[in-house]
From Swiss-Prot:
Active site as annotated: 133 (for autocatalytic cleavage activity), 170 (for autocatalytic cleavage activity)
Full protein name: LexA repressor
Top-level division of the source organism's lineage: Bacteria
Keyword flag Transmembrane helix: no
GO biological process terms on file: DNA repair; DNA replication; negative regulation of DNA-templated transcription; proteolysis; SOS response
Organism: Burkholderia cenocepacia (strain HI2424)
Amino acid sequence: MTKLTARQQQVFDLIRRAIERSGFPPTRAEIAAELGFSSPNAAEEHLRALARKGVIELAAGASRGIRLLGIDDAPHQFTLPHAGLMQLSLPLVGRVAAGSPILAQEHISQHYACDPALFTSKPDYLLKVRGLSMRDAGILDGDLLAVQKRTEAKDGQIIVARLGDDVTVKRLMRRPGGLELIAENPDYENIFVKAGSADFALEGIAVGLIRSGEL
């Protein structure tokens, strides 16, 4: 691996940990806050230095458009697309009716053509975020969350789950006797789900985020 300065190594390690923990990289603002930079612009300078050294790649215009390169065991990595390959066509899921599959045709409002470089792993669909319960994870009302269908998730990953008639986005943590779905906003309460609860179903994990104007 290319030799990095101590500060560059800190930034690189932070990106790697974020991908391992949640499935997608941090924003510039999150890097600045975590490492004590004066502004997101300082984080951007370090990211560009890492890109010049060939250890990450930046996707222009995407707040989380960061990929780790050249690391055999890099978490949640995928093969980089060759120039000219078709973009991903992802269904955008709107409101989900109770009891029906999340990708049922009536839930799909439209399809988006997306650059695969925006995501840490190939998503199956986009889910429009409603509310601010995940604000402190950088996920805001109206954002499009890229979701990969899964029936299992690791502790700390951001998931999409059914709770009764609702679909929610939360951070997953296993607890004695069940699961805790953690909100990333102190104004919202965490949700405890008892083991074996029939009201809970894991729909997938977050693998990227698109903010309005990035498509």
